[in-house]
Amino acid sequence: MGCTLSAEERAALERSKAIEKNLKEDGISAAKDVKLLLLGAGESGKSTIVKQMKIIHEDGFSGEDVKQYKPVVYSNTIQSLAAIVRAMDTLGIEYGDKERKADAKMVCDVVSRMEDTEPFSAELLSAMMRLWGDSGIQECFNRSREYQLNDSAKYYLDSLDRIGAADYQPTEQDILRTRVKTTGIVETHFTFKNLHFRLFDVGGQRSERKKWIHCFEDVTAIIFCVALSGYDQVLHEDETTNRMHESLMLFDSICNNKFFIDTSIILFLNKKDLFGEKIKKSPLTICFPEYTGPNTYEDAAAYIQAQFESKNRSPNKEIYCHMTCATDTNNIQVVFDAVTDIIIANNLRGCGLY
C-alpha cells in the first residue's frame, strides 16, 4: 500500500493541523469553557458519542448530513456481507445452498470494483438477501469473533429490503451505526447547562495515538470509551492482541500520564447491549483466564470495571464509570447529564465553592 493520501484524508489532516494550532494558541478561557477529550482504542464507540451530541445538543442531522451518510450505509452493508463471505472460505464453512456461490461472487465483485458506495441494483439486492438468508452464512456470522466484522452488520443486513429501496433515506439510527475510521482530531462544539463544551474525538487505531497527548494538557475531563464486547476479539491492526487487553493498556497509560494527573476521568464501558448478548455464549475467561465468576452480564461487567479501576495509581483521582450503549440516544442523554454534573461539581470544588 502506497503513501498517497486521498483527498478525504488530506482534508482530515489539514483540519487536524488547524485544530492543533488553535489548541496551542488558546487554552481554556474561563471555567464556563469545558474541554472534553474523547479517548479509547479503535471501534470503542467514540465517534458514535460525537454523533449523539449532535442529536441531543444541536439540531440533529441536516439534509446534507443524510445525503453524505447514504453512501456510507451502502458501503457498510455490502462490506459487512463481503467480510462474512470471505470468512466462509477461511473458516471452511459450506453454503446451505451451493447456488449462493454465484451470489457471493457478485457481492465480492462489486466491492473489488469499489462500487460499494452505490445504491444496490435490483439484481444485487436479491443476491444479498438470498445470501443473508443462507444457513451457512448465518453459521459464519455466529462465529464473527473469529474474524473482523462491523458491529452493525446484523442491523444493516436485517434491513436490506429497506436500505435497498429506490427511495431510501438513512434514518437517525442508520447514521448512528455507520462506521468510518476517524483520522486526526475532530472537534465538536455545543452548549449545555450554561457550559460551552468543546469535544475532541481522536483516532483510536494505534497509528493515530502519537497525535494525542501533547496538545491536551489543560483538558477539563477525559471520557475514555471501552467496547465491553471486545473481550473475545482481536485488534484490526494486530490480530495477536486481544481488544480488551489493548484497552486496559491504553487506559493505564492515559490514567497515569503526567499530563493528566489532575484530570477527571470518566469511563464509558460501552456496547453493553452487544456484551449482554455475547456473554451468554462466549465466556469471559477468553480474556481473563483467572475469572471464576458466573458468565452473567452483571458479574462479568463488574469484573471488567474493576480491572480498569485497578489501573489507577493515584489515590486522589476518582474514576467515574458508566455502562453505556452509544447507539441509544436516551441512554447517552442520561449519562451525559450525569457527566456534566460531575464536571460542574469538580469546577466548583476547584474554585473552593463546593
Curated annotation (Swiss-Prot):
Under Enzyme Commission nomenclature, its number is 3.6.5.-
- G2 motif, as annotated region: 174-182
Q: What is the effect of changing Q52P?
A: Found in a patient with intractable early-onset epilepsy; likely pathogenic; loss of GTP binding; decreased interaction with RGS19; decreased interaction with heterodimers formed by GNB1 and GNG3; strongly decreased localization to cell membrane
Location of region: G5 motif: 324-329
Q: Where does GTP bind?
A: E43, K46, S47, T48, S152, L176, R177, T178, R179, N270, D273, C325
Can you name a GO cellular component term?
A: plasma membrane
> Segment G1 motif: which positions?
35-48
Domain (G-alpha): residue spans on this chain? 32-354
Note the superkingdom of the native organism: Eukaryota
Q: Which GO terms describe its molecular function?
A: adenylate cyclase regulator activity; corticotropin-releasing hormone receptor 1 binding; G protein activity; G protein-coupled serotonin receptor binding; G-protein beta/gamma-subunit complex binding; GTP binding; GTPase activity; metal ion binding
What this protein catalyses is: GTP + H2O = GDP + phosphate + H(+)
* Summary of activators and inhibitors of this protein: The GTPase activity is promoted by GTPAse activators, such as RGS14, RGS16 and RGS19.
Q: Tell me how the protein is altered or processed after translation.
A: Histaminylated at Gln-205 residues by TGM2. Palmitoylated at Cys-351, leading to binding to ADGRG3.
Q: Mark the residues carrying the PTM ADP-ribosylarginine.
A: R179
Instruction: Spell out the Gene3D superfamilies in the cross-references.
Output: GI Alpha 1, domain 2-like, P-loop containing nucleotide triphosphate hydrolases
PTM-bearing positions, type 5-glutamyl histamine:
Q205
GO BP annotations of the record are: adenylate cyclase-inhibiting serotonin receptor signaling pathway; adenylate cyclase-modulating G protein-coupled receptor signaling pathway; G protein-coupled dopamine receptor signaling pathway; locomotory behavior; muscle contraction; negative regulation of insulin secretion; postsynaptic modulation of chemical synaptic transmission; regulation of heart contraction
Q: Which UniProt keywords apply?
A: ADP-ribosylation, Cell membrane, Disease variant, Epilepsy, GTP-binding, Hydrolase, Lipoprotein, Magnesium, Membrane, Metal-binding, Myristate, Nucleotide-binding, Palmitate, Transducer
Where are the stretches annotated G4 motif? 266-273
Q: Which residues are modified by lipidation (S-palmitoyl cysteine)?
A: C3, C351
Record-stated family: Belongs to the G-alpha family. G(i/o/t/z) subfamily.
Q: What is this protein called?
A: Guanine nucleotide-binding protein G(o) subunit alpha
Q: Which gene encodes it?
A: GNAO1
